[in-house]
Amino acid sequence: MKCFTGLVGAFTPEEVIFMLYMADRTRLREKGYDTLRSKRYYMENMEMGSRIFDKCVEKTTRMGLLERVPVSGMYDYLWHMDSYNRLVGILAELGNPFSTRAFCHRMFDVEKRTVASVSDEEVSQWKERHR
């Protein structure tokens, strides 16, 4: 799984780890692996506590990147690669780490938007104003 370096400037280290881990789980699922695991399993593999894990789940779900599906008393976490690839494209377009951090904070923390709701025009306008 490749890491897009723009994620590092735009999100917290825990959020980046969470995103990369979930994207990798999706890759494994697509290859036919059973990826249903307990919350404890995920937390141990990402070396994060319950509170941080839950915050990452909440934020990425709100962003339209993650879907929690109840299965056998656990949750299966489905990562939406189309939305993730769109996010990577937005970050690549913005380029500047300071600009990407401010943009992501505004769009996803303050306005609580989904990745899919962010238009190319908004990205271009932000880039123009925050050179």
What does each model-identified segment do?
Residues 10-11, 48, 118:
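Alpha-helical hairpin
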Residues 25-86:
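Winged helix-turn-helix DNA-binding recognition segment
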